[in-house]
Amino acid sequence: MNCNYLWKSSALLKNLHRRAKIIFEIRNYFFNLGILEVETPILSNYSVTDVNFIPFKTKLQITKKRMWLVPSPEYHMKRLLVQNIGAIYQISRSFRNNEFGGPYHNPEFTMLEWYSPYCNMFDFMKKVEKFLVFCLKVVQVKYISYQRAFIKYLNIDPLLAKKRELLDLINKFKFNHLISDCDSISTLLEILFTLKIEPNLNNKKLIFVYHYPADQAILAAINDNDSRVSDRFEVFFKGVELGNGFYELTDQAEHIRRFKLNNIQRRHKGICSVEVDQFFLKSLSRGLPPCSGIAIGLDRLIMLSLNLKTINEVIAFPIERC
């Protein structure tokens, strides 16, 4: 490794000063709203079963117990919500072993996670909109459903499409090398959304995409009026995904079902299964209040607010320099 220049920070020092100022302003924003800042562990007895995450693991020296670096503070924060702590947010480090390369990823990154009890998805999106407008100084905001986005940009209804129709689109766009015979409709939709719809979100509007298909719910609740969709949304700016939000699933039994399904999917993909977080499950038995939440990539948010191109321009020492 050539250390002649890698010893220096990838971010200009002036950008690190600007980063600190933005984080100060964010903390002040939440303080003025009466939203409590919390701190939860980044080293945990459990990880998450989400198929999209490969966690970092380590062992305690004395007991040899396996521990995990958290990919998100979600479970710990929800355990606080069960105790009726009220609206909370956190700025913390998160770790994902499969997020590396490109302008927007680093295995260690800064997450802004925010939960608002007794707030439905649409009301919460408005709160998120107000916050992001404050951070990014944007004027135009657009809302579009996942279904409408597919119809608008690909002329296909994702809630009605057959697998053959999606495979034909994949073939048309020459994405065949990205799929396998066993890929589900959900996987095909994710590929098409990432490669053909997200590029169309590359403008100066803040864009909310909501009501993702039910089998892409992750830990979002299924919509009360249409069981084909979940109360999940994502927000984009200049083609960059900034945040992933839910009206949160609260039912313990449904959590267990989804966790089991996740581990089956992990094994099919050749990824190790993950023990389910028993502390989190126990908290759910006490009752998670109705709430909405979002995880925002803070490095990306700062990058965009400073009109920069990569998160390495706002991180002191990314993975190749640390």
From Swiss-Prot:
<feature type="binding site">
    <location>
        <position position="248"/>
    </location>
    <ligand>
        <name>substrate</name>
    </ligand>
</feature>
<dbReference type="GO" id="GO:0005829">
    <property type="term" value="C:cytosol"/>
</dbReference>
<feature type="binding site">
    <location>
        <begin position="96"/>
        <end position="98"/>
    </location>
    <ligand>
        <name>ATP</name>
    </ligand>
</feature>
<dbReference type="InterPro" id="IPR006195">
    <property type="entry name" value="aa-tRNA-synth_II"/>
</dbReference>
<dbReference type="InterPro" id="IPR045864">
    <property type="entry name" value="aa-tRNA-synth_II/BPL/LPL"/>
</dbReference>
<dbReference type="Pfam" id="PF00152">
    <property type="entry name" value="tRNA-synt_2"/>
</dbReference>
<dbReference type="GO" id="GO:0005524">
    <property type="term" value="F:ATP binding"/>
</dbReference>
<keyword id="KW-0547">Nucleotide-binding</keyword>
<feature type="binding site">
    <location>
        <position position="297"/>
    </location>
    <ligand>
        <name>ATP</name>
    </ligand>
</feature>
<keyword id="KW-0436">Ligase</keyword>
<dbReference type="GO" id="GO:0016880">
    <property type="term" value="F:acid-ammonia (or amide) ligase activity"/>
</dbReference>
<comment type="function">
    <text>With EpmB is involved in the beta-lysylation step of the post-translational modification of translation elongation factor P (EF-P). Catalyzes the ATP-dependent activation of (R)-beta-lysine produced by EpmB, forming a lysyl-adenylate, from which the beta-lysyl moiety is then transferred to the epsilon-amino group of a conserved specific lysine residue in EF-P.</text>
</comment>
<dbReference type="InterPro" id="IPR004364">
    <property type="entry name" value="Aa-tRNA-synt_II"/>
</dbReference>
<dbReference type="GO" id="GO:0000049">
    <property type="term" value="F:tRNA binding"/>
</dbReference>
<dbReference type="GO" id="GO:0006430">
    <property type="term" value="P:lysyl-tRNA aminoacylation"/>
</dbReference>
<dbReference type="GO" id="GO:0004824">
    <property type="term" value="F:lysine-tRNA ligase activity"/>
</dbReference>
<protein>
    <recommendedName>
        <fullName>Elongation factor P--(R)-beta-lysine ligase</fullName>
        <ecNumber>6.3.2.-</ecNumber>
    </recommendedName>
</protein>
<comment type="similarity">
    <text>Belongs to the class-II aminoacyl-tRNA synthetase family. EpmA subfamily.</text>
</comment>
<comment type="subunit">
    <text>Homodimer.</text>
</comment>
<feature type="binding site">
    <location>
        <position position="115"/>
    </location>
    <ligand>
        <name>substrate</name>
    </ligand>
</feature>
<feature type="binding site">
    <location>
        <position position="106"/>
    </location>
    <ligand>
        <name>ATP</name>
    </ligand>
</feature>
<dbReference type="InterPro" id="IPR004525">
    <property type="entry name" value="EpmA"/>
</dbReference>
<feature type="binding site">
    <location>
        <begin position="72"/>
        <end position="74"/>
    </location>
    <ligand>
        <name>substrate</name>
    </ligand>
</feature>
<feature type="binding site">
    <location>
        <begin position="241"/>
        <end position="242"/>
    </location>
    <ligand>
        <name>ATP</name>
    </ligand>
</feature>
<keyword id="KW-0067">ATP-binding</keyword>
